């Protein structure tokens, strides 16, 4: 039987993206997921919204120390890249805001885990040139914003 390669990443943020102040998924589901990942030997990348990580640094450290990669998912789950469609009540960052916001988010996560964070995923999967340029300038190695089929590789 052929082995199947799977990349597994989870976004860690408020319960409904940018629209609620609740963290039940973080506080209640994370321990369940960590147990499942450990039982099945599944490594994951957890893409943390930095504001969420700041609220739950012990959970970030627990995941990281369990061998899971810590990635960045923005500062406040804002639209960092180019909007693909309008979302009421949200506005994309200005191009000149992108690099400082990603840098601030990166610094928060790196302070929590104690090492460089090199993976990124845009909220809402809205990427763009300004994001790519900022990630390159900050030394990121992976942008998980675009699914693999985007690159015609499966």
Where are each of the predicted segments found?
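Catalytic alpha-helical scaffold of carbohydrate-active enzymes acting on polysaccharides/glycoconjugates
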Residues: 1-119, 124-154
């Amino acid at each position: 039987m052929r082995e199947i390669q799977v990349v597994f990443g989870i976004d860690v943020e408020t319960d409904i993206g940018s629209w609620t102040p609740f963290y039940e998924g973080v506080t209640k589901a994370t321990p369940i997921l960590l147990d499942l990942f450990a039982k099945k030997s599944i490594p994951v990348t957890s893409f943390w919204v930095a504001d969420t990580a700041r609220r739950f640094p012990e959970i970030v450290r627990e995941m990281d120390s369990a061998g899971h990669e810590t990635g960045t998912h923005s500062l406040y789950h804002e639209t960092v890249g180019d909007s693909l469609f309008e979302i009421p009540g949200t506005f994309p960052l200005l191009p000149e805001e992108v690099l400082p916001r990603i840098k601030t988010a990166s610094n928060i996560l790196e302070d929590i885990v104690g090492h460089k964070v090199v993976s990124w995923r845009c909220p809402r999967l809205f990427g763009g040139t300004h994001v790519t340029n900022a990630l390159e300038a900050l030394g990121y190695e992976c942008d998980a914003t675009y699914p693999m089929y985007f690159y015609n590789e499966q």
